[in-house]
A protein has these predicted regions:
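Repeat-blade elements of multi-bladed beta-propeller folds
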Residues: 1-15, 35-59, 80-108, 133-165, ...
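Sequence-structural signature of mature extracellular/luminal beta-sheet repeat domains
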Residues: 15, 116-117
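Hydrophobic residues in beta-strands and at strand termini
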Residues: 18-19, 32, 61, 75, ...
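Short loop/turn segments that connect beta-strands within beta-propeller blades
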Residues: 20-24, 63-67, 111-115, 168-173, ...
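A short beta-strand motif characteristic of beta-propeller blades
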Residues: 25-35, 68-74, 118-131, 174-180, ...
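Kelch-like beta-propeller repeat domains
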Residues: 162, 175-180, 185, 206-212, ...
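Glycine-rich phosphate/oxyanion-binding loops and their immediately adjacent helices
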Residues: 202, 220-221, 245-246, 262-265, ...
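Ankyrin-repeat and related helical/solenoid repeat scaffolds used for protein-protein interactions
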Residues: 260, 265-275, 280-283
Length: 283
């Protein structure tokens, strides 16, 4: 969901809907989506007066006031749309995944401008495309003024082989620099912390990472710490500590899953708060 003024905006099947956040009354105004999600995990994104909604193999933009469609992007390779739709400086960034297929799945940057206001199903073309075998599963980007930081799956979509973490030129999508995880794909969004001037993420191989990157987008250091279990959780960083979800030994209640709290100065796990189940969400 997204909060837009007094309303909660959400998807239901092939419809974009909204309800009053105070009363719960559903608005009679409904947006028509160009498709549905076979696996809907990411919420809609609200930015620049628009709502951006993912469907299988594509993204659709709606007017946030009228819920009328503005344009549609249909990815040429397709796949699950399970990566966050990230907005920055007039563009959205998102990826697609044909899990374990070995296809060169695509991560795209799309200028959100509605070039043809008279057409509601205008087909959008991406500003640039970056490809990766086995794609982008829950992986979200972070953009600076000059470059984009992004993680992804490894080619075999497993938890043991290293996966790439890249910096991309913000205007062209060309690779500036590349590093690799200890093991497993990156299924979190990249977090940036101003106090430490560093980027943080996790891998489903069970590691927490800290990357330092210079102004040109080159990696200067990549540190990692073992979490004791898989993590797809986007790090929340506050007051010198990072908080991430970690999987335990199974899917039953209280099997070792936890929220791990990492002290960033010592770069060690300060403690773990046990949870009933695996806090698996990317957010």
């Amino acid at each position: 969901v997204a909060i837009v003024g007094d309303n909660i905006v959400y998807t239901s099947g092939d419809k974009l809907m909204r309800m009053n956040k105070e009363t719960g009354v559903v608005d009679s105004v409904v947006g028509q989506r160009a498709g549905t999600n076979s696996y809907a995990i990411q919420p809609v994104t609200y930015a620049d007066g628009m709502i951006f909604s993912a469907f299988n193999g594509g993204i659709q933009a709606f007017d946030a006031d009228t819920l009328e469609s503005l344009w549609v992007y249909k990815d040429s390779v397709g796949g699950q749309s399970v990566s966050p739709i990230y907005y920055n400086d007039g563009c959205i960034y998102t990826g697609f995944c044909n899990y374990g297929s070995g296809k060169n799945d695509q991560y795209v940057c799309i200028d959100v401008k509605d070039e043809d206001p008279d057409t509601t199903d205008e087909e959008k073309s991406p500003k640039w495309i970056f490809t990766n075998k086995s794609g982008f599963y829950w992986a979200g980007a972070y953009a600076t003024d000059d470059f984009v930081v992004l993680g992804m799956e490894n080619a075999k979509a497993n938890t043991t082989d290293p996966a790439r973490i890249v910096t991309l030129d913000k205007n062209s999508g060309s690779v500036i620099d590349t590093e690799y995880t200890v093991g497993g794909g990156v299924r979190s969004t990249i977090s940036y912390d101003k106090d430490t001037d560093a980027y943080y993420f996790t891998s489903n191989g069970g590691y927490f990472y800290k990357a330092t990157i210079d102004d040109e987008g080159n990696f200067t250091k990549l540190d990692s710490i073992a979490l004791g279990g898989a993590s797809t959780s986007t790090p929340t960083v506050l007051n010198g500590r990072a908080y991430v979800g970690v999987n335990g030994s199974g899917w039953g209640d209280y099997k070792g899953s936890a929220i791990a709290v990492i002290d960033l100065d010592s770069f060690e796990i300060a403690y773990k708060a046990e949870t009933k189940g695996y806090p698996q969400t990317s957010g």
